[in-house]
UniProtKB/Swiss-Prot annotation:
Zn(2+) 1 binds at residues 149, 152, 202, 205. PROSITE patterns: DNAJ_1 (PS00636), DNAJ_2 (PS50076), ZF_CR (PS51188). This is Chaperone protein DnaJ. Zn(2+) 2 binds at residues 166, 169, 188, 191. Disulfide bonds: none annotated.
Length: 380
């Protein structure tokens, strides 16, 4: 089945900005996260599709390659972003690995003599709250991975069984072939790349030297992370073949949407409702922050949409430095469920303001614009 356009997956146009891409990813990843849709295969596939799209569009270089070549730019790379098919997938190999596999490490031949295959890199998606993202936290996770077999200690052979060098590839694990001017390499079909022949394979791991195991890990998430950030846990991926080094584990962060705050980079945004009397006369109101409440002075004659900046109450960068700001947007509330007395008072206020444009600057500005529009329309 043909892959969907990555922009279409995120619901974006091709010219979308970096912030548009990040916002779309956060919204969709939160909506389709497996924790919120347990047991839903459709949600799981959609979540993988969203992550794959963001791995490419969220990276400037990969996005440029995708814009020019489409999916063909990554067809040989083992999956977007280097993940070989998701959580349990293959490594982060690039073009160097591709050419090494094709030409044995270079155009002159000289292929690998010892078959050492590093373990696969793994991916784990974790969802945290905004508070945890801003302040940092520790999370215990459980992953399933290939680990060294306890029975044979990675040899792949039963105790006392002979392990001989493969006679087909002479222990290299690879077969070299001459094709014109080029020397190519392929995995040995006899030993399947191990470089050895086992007389009696280990019954626990069937000769692989590795078995699937569950592993518990404690992950320290630094303060200031955001959705899409990745934490690399070196050596916590799958065990390598034949004693080769293990791969790495990449923990991908997803920050849940907050009931009050919306994050944009290092700044936090929130809406603050105020009464129309406070908007007219001014006053003081309590506003929330992630560190507790603080008082904000509202000047007289404040209009809906006015922004107030509270410095240093945003998010600090994981790399250090100053915290961003909290931006409060004022929303003037219209009173509801009024009794007759209250309605009479408002009518008297309305009558006292009638015909006095200085009391209604926005309305008068709007009416002037309408008059000018129709006046200019009549001249054409």
């Amino acid at each position: 089945m043909a892959k969907k356009d990555y922009y279409e997956v995120l619901g974006l146009q091709k010219g979308a900005s970096e912030n548009d891409i990040k916002r779309a990813y956060k919204r969709l990843a939160s909506k389709h996260h497996p924790d919120k849709n347990q047991g839903s295969k459709d949600a799981e596939e959609k979540f993988k599709e969203i992550n794959e799209a963001y791995e490419v569009l969220g990276d400037a270089e990969k996005r440029a390659a995708y814009d020019q070549y489409g999916h063909a730019a990554f067809e040989q790379g083992g999956g977007a972003g280097g993940f070989g098919g998701g959580f349990g997938g293959g490594g982060f190999g690039g073009f160097e690995d591709i050419f090494s596999e094709m030409f044995g490490g270079g155009f002159g031949g000289g292929g690998r003599r010892n078959h050492v295959v590093r373990g696969d890199d793994l991916r784990y998606d974790i969802e945290i709250s905004l508070e945890e993202a801003v302040k940092g936290c520790k999370k215990d996770i459980r992953i399933s991975t290939l680990a060294e077999c306890d029975t044979c200690h990675g040899s792949g052979a039963e105790k006392g069984s002979k392990v001989e060098t493969c006679s087909h590839c002479h222990g290299s694990g690879r077969i070299r072939r001459q094709q014109g001017f080029f020397v190519t390499e392929a995995v040995c079909p006899s030993c399947h790349g191990s470089g050895k022949k086992i007389e009696k394979p280990c019954k626990s791991c069937h000769g692989d030297g590795r078995v699937q195991k569950a592993k518990n890990l404690s992950v320290t998430i630094p303060a200031g992370v955001d959705t899409g950030n990745q934490l690399r846990l070196s050596g916590e991926g799958a065990a390598g073949e034949n004693g080769a080094p293990a791969g790495d584990l990449y923990v991908v962060i997803h920050v849940r949407e907050h009931d009050i705050f919306e994050r944009d980079g290092s700044n936090l945004y929130c809406e603050v409702p105020i009464s129309f009397t406070m908007a007219a006369l001014g006053g003081e109101i309590e506003v929330p922050t992630l560190d507790g409440k603080l008082k904000l002075k509202i000047p007289a004659e404040t209009q809906t949409g006015k922004l107030f900046r509270v410095r240093g109450k945003g998010v600090a960068s994981p790399r250090g430095g100053y915290a961003g700001d909290l931006i409060c947007k004022v929303v003037v509330e219209t009173p509801v469920a009024l009794n007759d007395e209250q309605k009479d008072l408002l009518r008297k206020l309305e009558e006292s303001l009638a015909g006095k444009s200085k009391h209604r600057p926005q309305q008068e500005s709007f009416l002037d614009s309408v008059k000018n529009f129709f006046s200019n329309l009549g001249k054409h």
